[in-house]
Regions:
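C-terminal accessory regions of radical SAM enzymes
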Residues: 71, 87-89, 93-139
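Conserved AdoMet/S-adenosylmethionine-binding subsite of the radical SAM
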Residues: 1-93
């Protein structure tokens, strides 16, 4: 299926939304493990190589999601910018929207399913620091 999508329905850039790399944050987002994105990335590159395509996979990530700390963003940067060598283009701070689990956690500071406290980056400075990890250069 992926090969059909890449070869016949992609115009050069395939945008996907893994949203984060850290399992704890992904669990709060109700997203699958990051290993699935890594597998998709490997398969995408393999398909492009075998078909002579110079296509790009464009991942979308979120900063300041409830449960996400600066340490999580540092780990994300290490995996995505370092190990996988992506240059990120799409960066979004969490924007709370009505009727979503993420918004409930943002406003209450807890996971409604477990009652567990969840860290929330609330100040502009906390959000700026988290987002800054997307654009840090390797030294």
């Amino acid at each position: 299926y992926l090969e059909t999508v890449v070869r016949h329905h992609t115009s050069g850039r395939l945008k996907v939304a893994p949203e984060h790399t850290e399992e704890r944050v992904l669990a709060l987002m109700r997203k699958p493990p990051f290993a699935l994105f890594e597998r998709l990335n490997d398969d995408f590159r393999s398909i492009c190589r075998s078909n002579g395509l110079n296509y790009q996979l464009i991942p979308y990530f979120i900063s300041s999601h409830p449960g996400c700390t600066e340490r999580d963003m540092q780990a994300l940067a290490g995996k995505v910018l370092g190990r996988l060598h992506f240059t990120l283009e799409q960066v979004q701070d969490l924007t709370p929207t009505p009727m979503t689990l993420s918004s409930v956690m943002f406003y209450t500071g807890e996971n409604p399913y477990t009652g567990e406290k969840v860290y929330v980056a609330r100040s502009q400075e906390e959000k700026r620091r988290q987002k800054s990890y997307f654009f840090r250069r390797k030294r």
